[in-house]
Amino acid sequence: MSKSVYWCPHCGIPVIENKICPVCKAEGEIISTNGICNPVFVQEKRLLSCIIGEDINNSNVWYLGSSQYLVDGVRKRISYGEFYKAKRHLECADKILIDAVHDDTIYNLDLYIKANQRYINELIFEAEIYVTDLVRELKESSEDGISYIPTVSFSGGKDSTVVSRIVRDALQNESVIHFFGDTTLEFPSTHVYVDGDFRVENPFTPMIPSETENDFFKLCNVFGPPSKFERWCCTIFKTSNLNSEYQNLNGNSLTFLGIRRSESKERQKYERTQKHSKIGSQINAMPIIDWYDCDVWLYILYKGIKFNEAYRWGYKRVGCWCCPNNSD
């Protein structure tokens, strides 16, 4: 799986899947083939400035994956490892935290959106058609009065944030039920986002938290820490709790998830629609399964959606803080 992103040196913007910039017609230079080209916000720029000993706070910076960054059109490898081993982050903490306002400024944002607008609109159209077609198909094929109720599995991360908006726009319904699976291991910023910004931005969207009675650290003593090969935590802290919530629905759940194939080799094998899931009364649907990081961020910036604060600080994933899949 691959997706190419080009850099237009004239406009100073990434252009997705188009070597010729749609704005200025200049030929771009390829900067990514893995579909990763994420905006870097002021908070992360401050940290990066401390790491490399160079002020890039006012630079045009994009993250390309695997510790690779594009700084004013020049690729740089910026590794956190040695920085943390030397405990230099303790020295820089005050500099990073001072006046840490919500500055979402992205260089040449208008040009970036203009250059990629046709591309993202095609992705949006396809995803929304998938949602409406699936809902209609299940409604027409329902037997014995069994109905499927559209819901969104919401984690507070960028992918479920995008899926939430796509599903509600496609169905023209702000009242689609959202289930937030609280594993008790979320970043504080996730709770702030779910209980604050998301609710304020979407006052008519019900958010039902699913809480667990289990203690993660006590279970670690029983099963051992979760690993990529033994993720018992997902079953105990997410699946079982959500299953209890789904039982309260007046019908079965058509659950829309923010899962993408580009996230891992395991997920490359996923079907877009899973009619046989871990939860018997549930069908899983993944509208953005073939999207890449660059697509998700383009959508967020294009729609002007609020998002989890942790991304501003450089986190690439904002699920459980101790997740074994958090390798980048």
Label every model-predicted segment.
Residues 316-328:
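Local cysteine-cluster metal-coordination motifs and their immediate loop/turn environment
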